[in-house]
């Protein structure tokens, strides 16, 4: 866990609560200066902040711009910061010599399977000197479903974050009655012409 890793928890199983507790516990470690919780969309930024506030009012800080993010990174009282991948990317690009890059930072990515993570991963490893990287996902990318990537060393979730630290799959959640079971029905809606090539 010292270097990081990823947590595979199915949708609806409480990933946000787990990530909040992870962020909260990290801030209690004397040697951790900041915890960044990174989401990939603005609506998730707002949603995560609302959830975190529900767990503990005022425990986390969100931001509306890169300038606000910069102020929060410089504020010793702002321990947990929720931001978007876009704001963090802009901050890194515009503040190459910033003091945060020399501090001990835990960076937690929500939905760490997203495609734009590759560029952010390179920026983090280039600028941050002392970081721990964790990812939460309901749909990890494995070698068998990785597809093509600009960076072949970051094709899978494991390549980007390290070891899988915990798993709670849809089967686990259904068995525990934490999510409802579902059934897939395939319905044939029309008969295909036998001599039509699907590739056409």
Residue ranges and their predicted role:
Residues 54, 67-81, 98-99:
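Conserved motor-coupling elements within RecA-like helicase/translocase cores
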Residues 146-200:
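Interdomain helical connector at the RecA1-RecA2 junction of SF1/SF2 helicase-like NTPases
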Residues 27-28, 42-66:
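Conserved helix-turn-beta segment of the N-terminal RecA-like "Helicase ATP-binding" lobe
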């Amino acid at each position: 866990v010292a270097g990081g890793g990823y947590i595979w928890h199915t949708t609806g199983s409480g990933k946000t609560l787990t990530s909040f507790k992870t962020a909260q516990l990290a801030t209690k470690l004397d040697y951790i200066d900041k915890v960044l919780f990174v989401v990939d969309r603005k609506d998730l930024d707002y949603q995560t902040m609302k959830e975190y506030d529900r767990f503990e009012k005022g425990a986390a800080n969100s931001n509306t711009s890169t300038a606000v993010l910069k102020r929060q990174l410089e504020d010793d009282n702002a321990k947990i910061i929720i931001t978007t991948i876009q704001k963090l990317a802009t901050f890194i690009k515009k503040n190459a010599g910033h003091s945060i890059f020399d501090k001990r930072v835990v960076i937690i990515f929500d939905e760490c399977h997203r495609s734009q993570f590759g560029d952010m991963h390179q920026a983090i490893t280039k600028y941050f000197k002392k970081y721990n990287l964790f990812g939460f996902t309901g749909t990890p990318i494995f070698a068998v479903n990785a597809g093509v990537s600009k960076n072949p060393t970051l094709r899978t979730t494991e390549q980007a974050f390290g070891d899988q630290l915990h798993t709670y799959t849809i089967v686990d959640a259904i068995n525990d009655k934490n999510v409802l079971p579902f059934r897939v029905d395939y319905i044939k809606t029309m008969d295909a012409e036998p001599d039509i090539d699907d590739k056409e």
